[in-house]
Structure formats: C-alpha cells, structure tokens
Amino acid sequence: MKMIDIVKNKTVLLLGLAKSGESAARLLDKLGAIVTVNDGKPFEENPTAQSLLEDGIRVICGSHPLELLDEDFALMVKNPGIRYDNPMVEKAIGKGIPVWTEVELAYLVSDVPIVGITGSNGKTTTTTMIAEVLNAGKKPAKLCGNIGYPASSVAQTATAEDTLVMELSSFQLMGTESFHPHIAVVTNLIASHIDYHGTFEDYVAAKWMIQRQMTAEDFVVINFNQKEAKELAGQTKATVVPFSTQEVVDGAYLADGKLYFKGEYIMDADQIGVPGSHNVENALATIVVAKLLGVDQQAIQESLSAFGGVKHRLQFVGEINGVSFYNDSKSTNILATQKALSGFDNSKVILIAGGLDRGNEFDELVPDLVGLKKMVILGQSAPRVQRAADKAEVETIEALDIADATRKAFAIAEKGDIVLLSPANASWDMYANFEVRGDVFLQTFEELK
C-alpha cells in the first residue's frame, strides 16, 4: 500500500457523492483522513449522505458553498462528472489544492498490476472481454472503474495474485497524478464530450494521461486503424504494441479472416461470440493484453468464442418468430452505429435511430444506411436522421418513443430479419441515460414475446 501516510490526519474535501464518491469517502476515513463530504442533493433526500454521517463523517448537503474552501483543505477528491469550471473546483485549484478522482486513490491503496482501458467507443466491452479472458487463463482479474464498480473499493479487496482491469473515462484520468498502469489500452479516439473538454485536442490529452507515469517496462496498446490514435505511438515512454484490422502490425492483427498475434494464429474472426467489425477490434486489443500477461492461445480462443457481450452494447436480446433483436443503446454517436451495422446484412436490418439533437448532420452515416430494410426514427434529431435516410434511399417510419419504435419495427419484420436499436444519438431528450433507454427496449421485447 503506497499512500497511508499521504492522507493520514490530512483534511480532505470530497466533492460529489454517487457510488464512487461514497467508496472514496469511506476509504479516506479508513486511512485516517479528516473527511468533509459536500454533495448538492438535499440531506433529507440523500440516504448515502445520511449513512456517512451516521458513521461519523462530516457531511454538508444541498448546495456547494464556496466559503467551505476557506477552510484549510490539503486535498480535494471530486466526482469525475463534476467539471473543472465548477466554482468549487476552480477555487480549489486557485488555492493550490490538488484535485483527484477516486482512480488515483485506487492506485495508491493497492500494489497489484493495473490494466487500464480508455477510448471513445468500446471501453466497456473491451474491459469485460479482457477480464473474462484473463480469468479463463487462470490470471485472476477484477473489473472496476467506469464500468460500475468503484475502483477505490475493488482495489482494497485485491490480493497479490489479482490484476485490476479498469475502465477509465477522460473525466477520471484528468484527476490523476501518480496513477501508473502496467498496461494501457486506447480503443479509439473520436470527438466526444467536447462540451466538457472544449476541444478535441484537449479531449485526447485527457485520455493520454493514462500513460504519463509509464516506463519502457510498461505497455501501451493502440488501435493503428485510427490516424489520431496511431500518432500517439511516438509520444510515450512505454512500449507500444499495436492492433489493427487493416494491416499486419507487430502486435495483434486481422488477415484473411483470421486473428494473429505476432504471427501466431489465435482464432478465426467469425468465432468471436459477438458480431461487428468493432468487436474484432475489441478482440484484438484483448488478445494483446492476454498475450502480454501470459494467457495461452486455447484459453483466449475459448473465452472470446463464448463471450456474450455486455448489456446495451450490441447485446443479443433474443428472437420472436424468427426475428432477432439487438440492443445497442450505448450507441450515442455515428461511429458506434457504423460499427454496429458492419456486423449485419443491411437488407435484413430494421434500424431504430434518433435521440438528442446536438446539431450535427448524419452525412457520414449515409453509406452505412444504404440497403437497410427500413428505419424507425424518433427523438429531437429525427429530422436530421430523416435527411440521412433520404440520401441513402431508405424508407422510414416515425415513432413516439423507444417502446413505440420497437413495436413498429417488429410489426414490419419478417422471419430472418433483425431489429437493431442503435440510435447514433444520446438519450437525454427522452431518457435519463442510455441504460434507461435500453431497458425500455428490453421491456418491450418481453411484452412482444
């Protein structure tokens, strides 16, 4: 354990609760810090804050009073979703107070190796794939991070034999200083969260923080399909191991429908348990990590063949009267929907698309829409999606919401067809998040059975 003395008897302000905030608060308290928790949710509506107070941790709820920072705090640990232009964060930085996320705590309380996975798309699937392959290869792995299990909590339970497999967002990485994974994976890079970061360059810089403490004994796994990611290869002290579906590289690659690692045959691409070209990329990244950590070819092949996917990420839901349903609600941008469509015969696909209108047109998606059986469109962005469908010469049906869209798609589907929810848009015009949107799709499927 690297950090006990770093926080012991130090005053720490924890800004924002949620699941990871509670975990961080309890860990800091356990390590002897003098913790103050500040959360915007009113105390009477905040059972987490109530529980922390009962356990002797100071809690201030209902607002974020700037005068709180007049106290002499040695450290701020913030929820990753809280922006750096938040007045509390700005004041802390102005006073020279270090600002961390709980990922930094997770690193500092555990001595086990970390595999960190970041990128714009594919993080959760790749993180899950890696953990499953490592466990199948008798290399015990624990999932944590942005995937829903607080890293600071999981890190405390890790034993010497374990590897932490950690999904990392740009928001989390911005709050790190000494964080040092043994292997870092960059799945891909496209413009995302620009409202948070300001520019694409700043977004990439936040992602690239994953490797800043790495050395030549560590490994960065990079998607060489992408120019933006490939350009990072010369900007690290770590050893770069690439993967690609487009060229033979000194790492993992696709050639003639087969997956290889440095010339060693691993498996056929069509043996991967989930469809789509993006899942071939995810599998290649997984193969690199597995081989670096000593997993044999048979364990990799068997695990990737059995991989069933992740909820809301091109998840096979089931069949009704020979019609297959796939839930790709996590598809919140054009690239994700392009990747989803790549795994299917368009002539059999009824695509459900549309959602929050962010002002972007969908011209990039037009070539991928050509030949679709039909589209069901909805949400604020429906007029823009309609324009793309018109250019692709695909007929559309309008829907009120996801439940309505699912029913309308099924009504026109025939045996052998595919109903694919892959919205290419965020959910916030109708639903709290992509999980809620996907759950409505799943619930409607159950009602149609």
Curated annotation (Swiss-Prot):
Any one cellular-component term (Gene Ontology): cytoplasm
A GO term, aspect molecular function: UDP-N-acetylmuramoylalanine-D-glutamate ligase activity
Keyword line: ATP-binding, Cell cycle, Cell division, Cell shape, Cell wall biogenesis/degradation, Cytoplasm, Ligase, Nucleotide-binding, Peptidoglycan synthesis
Pathway: Cell wall biogenesis; peptidoglycan biosynthesis
The reaction(s) this protein catalyses: UDP-N-acetyl-alpha-D-muramoyl-L-alanine + D-glutamate + ATP = UDP-N-acetyl-alpha-D-muramoyl-L-alanyl-D-glutamate + ADP + phosphate + H(+)
GO biological process: cell division; cell wall organization; peptidoglycan biosynthetic process; regulation of cell shape
Residues engaged in binding ATP: G119, S120, N121, G122, K123, T124, T125
EC number(s) given by UniProt: 6.3.2.9
Record InterPro entries: Mur-like_cat_sf, Mur_ligase_C, Mur_ligase_C_dom_sf, Mur_ligase_cen, MurD
Compartments where found: Cytoplasm
A Pfam family reported for this protein in Swiss-Prot or TrEMBL: MurD-like_N
Similarity remark: Belongs to the MurCDEF family.
The protein's role, per its UniProt record: Cell wall formation. Catalyzes the addition of glutamate to the nucleotide precursor UDP-N-acetylmuramoyl-L-alanine (UMA).
HAMAP family: MurD
Name recorded for this polypeptide: UDP-N-acetylmuramoylalanine--D-glutamate ligase
Originating species: Streptococcus suis (strain 05ZYH33)
Gene (name only): murD
